[in-house]
Amino acid sequence: MTHRFAIIGAGAAGSFTARRLRQHFPDAEIVVFEREQQVGGRAATVTFCGEQVEVGGTLLHSSNRRIVELAAELGLEYSPPGVALGDMDASVTVWDGQRFVFRASTKGMAFLFSLVRRYGLFNLRRLRAAAGETIAKWNSIYDKQDAGVVFESVGDVVEALELGVETKVSLREFARSRKISERVVDEIGAGILRNMYNQTPDISSLAGMVGLAGAGFAGGSLFSIERGNAAVFAGALERADAEVRLGETVVGVSNTLELTTETGATEAFDAVVLAAPVELAGVALPATPTTTDEGYQRVHVTLVAGLVNGSYFGVPEAPGTIFTTPSAPFKSFGRVGFSESEQLPIYKFFSETELGDGFLSQVFGSILDVHRLSWLAYPKMAVNPSLHSFNLAPGVYTTNVQEAICSTLETEAVAGWSVADLVARDFGGRAAAAS
């Protein structure tokens, strides 16, 4: 019997669901619906001043096994090539809205010495150990998946990986229990989490430690894909031999697994995977949907082509990357590219609210162009999160409920893998039958 599977969403979760489903069902028909005109989900790019600029999901980590393995399979190049924290020739700072409380070159030992001087060697060791232990627990999911373990719910994932404690306390509380100083939490922790999630160290310890590890504080190296991180997800869909329908919005799924699109067209499938947040997808489902009870966090991105007025920051020249404490008017700021056509650097802000022209005129001495975007990017990853089932209704599955515990491109890819395995168990896929 040839199965027909529908996937709603062509981001990390949707593309890896498709890729894994193809491994289970060599002859299945896999159709991916994506309401945008590009694949990649939050790893989105825009054309700005003649350059392709990534506006979200910009960094990957060497421990991201699913993405790293597929990138290697696809022959994708890294940019920059696998740098470790302390190897990048740039500068990074923490700004409190008035002054830089931390500032250092990220090149070589100078960065490490600056960290030790500000935060203390033993604090940094304890941070690295705590982040490393958490990531080691999370990374055990790969061997479990490869061994044929099927997860029916996010609760199953948390229990199998022994991450219950990390989901029940905040990063701040967890750090305190590990004797990591408040300064580390309020400057390093807050700076990175404000940049990554637009949130604070009061998020769950699991989400916080995943964020810190993703910034290099558990070892490993950071990188991006030369052609943009979305190239991995486009490659996953190609390897899945999926039919990808861009610009096609699904508005409903019936009890009989019939999909309805925005144009009124209908189509029947054997199973449907919603690879997008239930509460944001705008899809009427055959059962009361489970949602991320804590809601989603809005992120504003502002791209600016221009010349920075260093005096705004009290320095002759703005650093390459600026993280911030809660008293600052934006979450993070940094140079992300260079417009060859305009011969101007391109900068990116993350902020909680829209940054107006008046504010930008203070930061920049001259501005050629501005591009603003806003979206509900991440769930609010609170302590004691909802641990919902991946199965919404008979034949209807969802990947994004896992975002309640942590949310990165890799964890979404892992969720897609888990859901594909669940579908395979329910529909007798080849790998499921062999296990």
Please identify what each model-predicted range represents:
Residues 22-48:
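Glycine-rich FAD pyrophosphate-binding loop
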Residues 251-371:
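Mid-domain catalytic core of redox enzymes
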